[in-house]
Amino acid sequence: IYAADYGCVQRRRRTFIFAFKNTTKQYERMTSCFSADTKDGRVWLMQEGFFAHAFPVHSEVADPKKVTTVDFNEYTDTVDVTNRFRAAFYNSGVLCNGKIFSLEAVPNGKEPMLLGEIVVNGDIDKSFFIEDEDLEKWKYMKGAKTIERTSKTGYSYTFSEGPIAFPDPLDRPGRTMLTSEGTKNRSSHAITDPKTGKLRILLPEECERMNGFPTGWTDTG
């Protein structure tokens, strides 16, 4: 599930798994969707399922070719699965009584919020601004790099990482926020302050808004 597809201000993509016992009403509802007519989990994934209500999708799939149906009851053991299993999984799927059904669903959510919509446009304490002497360090952290490294055991390898936008664009949702936000590191957001035009990190209230909380949520006084 991609958070920006459902009106959030983060480009945050996460995999969610919802499981339940076969003695529950959820199980009864799910098995009823695997009827003789459909022979797959399309109704459950797109209309009746737990995620379909919380994160609705369109009735048409993204690509008719991106549909997978697998019956693990046709395999004798895990070795047989390893030797014969060939299938692709997509952004939605369900497993019911050994049968897997997966498809590429199209989110039917809301337009994402943009980072610029939650940014404070006013007087900001100078402690949030990036000092001139730190600018090159920030550029290095955000930039692409390839570094030859050697582990403690003597194993040599190449460490590489791609670039991150610096500063973060205000006309897009923000990147995934980590717990290290606000510190001097590669993952912290750095924006152009709307009022001064100078680079700064996010304010606590801006971080609250990015995570879906009201302003002042973390203010303990």
Q: What is each residue range found by the language model?
A:
Residues 1-166:
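Class I S-adenosyl-L-methionine
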